[in-house]
Amino acid sequence: MKTGVATSRTDRLASKYLRLAKYAVVSPMIGLIVRYSSFLDGTNGAPPATLNYGADGDFIKQGDTIVAAIGRDVPLDETTRVLDIGCGIGRIATAFARQNRIGLYRGFDVVRYGILWCRKAIRDPRYRFDYANIRNDFYNPFGAVEPEDYTFPYEDRSFDLAVAISVFTHLPESQTRRYFAEAMRCLDTGGRAYFTTFLAENRQPGARFALAHSIGEALVERLEEPDLAVGYSRAFWERLAAEHDAVIETVHDGSWSGRKGLRDFQDVLIFRKTG
């Protein structure tokens, strides 16, 4: 038993130091290559697979699929102002740009080379990408700003749509509350938020994540690595929305729960700003 515990701790330490090496040492070097050469520019509007830290699979197809899903529930036109929270390396931004479906886009992320790549790939003046030097245990371990203290660099009521894909599925309660409050501050009255999450009550036998451990309102997959997968109850989201003059307008259940035949992997919550 003790041997197993020791091995687990060793594995966790090894994993931690590998992440530190990748994102504290290698990541800045990648940023320099992206900024000053064309070696990592990618092809056909997509980054090289080695740079795509957001998700595995077909970058173009995934972006188009997400934007199509958003468009089924949220009106998009040449006047729509979009905030992309955790924009990554531009999976959604490049899809919006290809389809020319919106009027203004702002995205931010904690991985600098992702922001640098986006700035090179999308030159449209309606699009802007901001580096957020937020501390993140996985992607930005030496970040200068704590997530709970971060203020989105945008004016009040300056967006019609806020998007967060696979962001709240990795945030503890304190950070979730801060990001949600900031998103609602930035949304105009009547604006909508398209957020993905794991709704804890949706779990069934065979669910991808058990989310068996509680940390405050959050339910996590692993106590030793809590940001691996984080879920919340629908009641939590409803209370949070009410605190910020918003309501849940639409819910789409995801297949992570163990249910078959669903369109999305993560659950989708669409909020409407009422005040």
What are these regions (language model features)?
Residues 172-173:
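Helix-capping/helix-break motifs at membrane-protein junctions
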Residues 177-189:
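A short glycine-rich, Lys/Arg-flanked "PGG" loop and its adjoining helix->strand segment in the class I
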Residues 163:
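A conserved beta-strand element that flanks and buttresses the S-adenosyl-L-methionine
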Residues 79-88, 106:
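Conserved class I S-adenosyl-L-methionine
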Residues 2-73, 89-96, 101-151, 177-178, ...:
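Class I (Rossmann-like) S-adenosyl-L-methionine-dependent methyltransferase catalytic domain
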Residues 166-167:
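Short catalytic micro-motifs in class I SAM-dependent methyltransferases
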Residues 81, 190-192:
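Short glycine-centered segments of the SAM/dcSAM-binding site in methyltransferase folds
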